[in-house]
Amino acid sequence: MKLAYWMYAGPAHIGTLRVASSFRNVHAIMHAPLGDDYFNVMRSMLERERDFTPVTASIVDRHVLARGSQEKVVENITRKDKEERPDLIVLTPTCTSSILQEDLQNFVDRASIASNSDVILADVNHYRVNELQAADRTLEQVVRYYLDKARRQGTLSQSITEKPSVNIIGMFTLGFHNQHDCKELKRLLQDLGIQVNEVIPEGGSVENLRNLPKAWLNLVPYREVGLMTALYLEKEFGMPYVATTPMGIVGTAEFVRQIQSHINKWAPMFLGKLVDYEPYIDQQTRFISQAAWFSRSIDCQNLTGKKVVVFGDTTHAASMTKILAREMGIHVVCAGTYCKHDADWFKEQVQGYCDEILVTDDHTQVGDMIARIEPAAIFGSQMERHIGKRLDIPCGVISAPVHIQNFPLGYRPFLGYEGTNQIADLVYNSFTLGMEDHLLEMFGGHDTKEVITKSLSTDTDFTWDSESQLELTKIPGFVRAKIKRNTEKFARQNGVAKITVEVMYAAKEALNA
């Protein structure tokens, strides 16, 4: 446990609540103190939906500490069962309930007797896993629970559909452009003549989970959530899965080819022939998606060799690194992720596409790395956007966690062929163009907070005299910040408090020596 004012991945109970509130007619009860119940506000603010967030906080207060929680928790479960009549109630433990060492499973067993709804306890260890790991585990737990229930009742679907069909696993609330990505995936699958059997958890019903084995295969577009469920379905029902993320021209083509190879195992029996999606890939790449053409245009060639930093969750950071390096010829100096639990996979994916790899959940390390590298642009999360503003470096947001700007009302997918167009736009618009630099130089731009050290520390005790300031304005804008930083570094090393023109030249000589 650590105190931080910024976390890339939240505590475990947030992941569980995200999965529970993504399903239709599922209610979550969180056993937590006041302050842990910010999820309702966060989801209501960010997800632009009309429905209320189906989460109730069972508050741990002084009465609970004195008498125990059982009576209160059981009462909350039975009350919500009568009021909302959900299909499922998920009791979510928190760090506080773990510290109190209460037997929440016993509370669930007691409440189940008096409830018409199914009641389960989210099986996550709050001191071992973060938000994304907990979401993955909770989704697998819910799927396992309902498939076991269907098996006991004899209602489990054993036969597969006549036409090729898939389950899309891992689309859920507060995800990065998840709803747009889901629409784009459905459109791509429709073009290929593939039916969508179930989408879980976003908008799915727990009563329909028994239909999951009907599909020919499962699609897991994001590694963070859905992989455990896909592995469980593969083990129990022999269902293959595709975990390649269809981001970028190359990634989407690979995704479609993997689907083709799995479908062709059943196609001769059900369709009487093999399927061939190569003409579709060729048509989309050459004529529908603008990204392949754009990457060969003079506009994109101006970006060749530009230095960038990429940071985010494993799925988006790895895919973005490969798109920038492989499809656009942009130099990725450092690629990083905050998903420490999946570091090995990430390193394997980006190896050879970048100079450095950073795996950390400490935003100060990320900030110091960006300040050291001084890239032309950053591609990261909301935190990297803040860092970019401090350092006056443009940033394109490509990964959660994000703020309201990245829950757009318009159609902005990142997956599929339409996603390639969005990514190309984002990349191009994230760079400050040369002419823009000159125009800002001539006519002035917005006031900016310039950062002049190699870290995000704000301590500085230097004064520049009028002559040195005038000399600084004569230096071209694209190197001015770097020269200012190097001069102050020289002054700091030599104990100089006031910077003059002589100090500037001395710093230049020392640097060239």
From Swiss-Prot:
Active-site positions on this chain: 299
Reaction catalysis annotation: chlorophyllide a + oxidized 2[4Fe-4S]-[ferredoxin] + 2 ADP + 2 phosphate = protochlorophyllide a + reduced 2[4Fe-4S]-[ferredoxin] + 2 ATP + 2 H2O
Gene Ontology CC annotation, any one: chloroplast
Provenance organism: Zygnema circumcarinatum
Entry EC number(s): 1.3.7.7
Broad EC category: oxidoreductase
Similarity-based family: Belongs to the ChlB/BchB/BchZ family.
Subcellular location: Plastid, Chloroplast
The protein's assembly and partners: Protochlorophyllide reductase is composed of three subunits; ChlL, ChlN and ChlB. Forms a heterotetramer of two ChlB and two ChlN subunits.
UniProt-annotated binding residues for [4Fe-4S] cluster: 36
A biological process term (GO) from this entry: light-independent chlorophyll biosynthetic process
Co-factor binding comment: Binds 1 [4Fe-4S] cluster per heterodimer. The cluster is bound at the heterodimer interface by residues from both subunits.
Record-linked NCBIfam families: DPOR_BchB
Classification via Pfam families: Oxidored_nitro (PF00148), PCP_red (PF08369)
Protein name: Light-independent protochlorophyllide reductase subunit B
Role this protein plays: Component of the dark-operative protochlorophyllide reductase (DPOR) that uses Mg-ATP and reduced ferredoxin to reduce ring D of protochlorophyllide (Pchlide) to form chlorophyllide a (Chlide). This reaction is light-independent. The NB-protein (ChlN-ChlB) is the catalytic component of the complex.
Cofactor: [4Fe-4S] cluster
Keywords assigned: 4Fe-4S, ATP-binding, Chlorophyll biosynthesis, Chloroplast, Iron, Iron-sulfur, Metal-binding, Nucleotide-binding, Oxidoreductase, Photosynthesis, Plastid
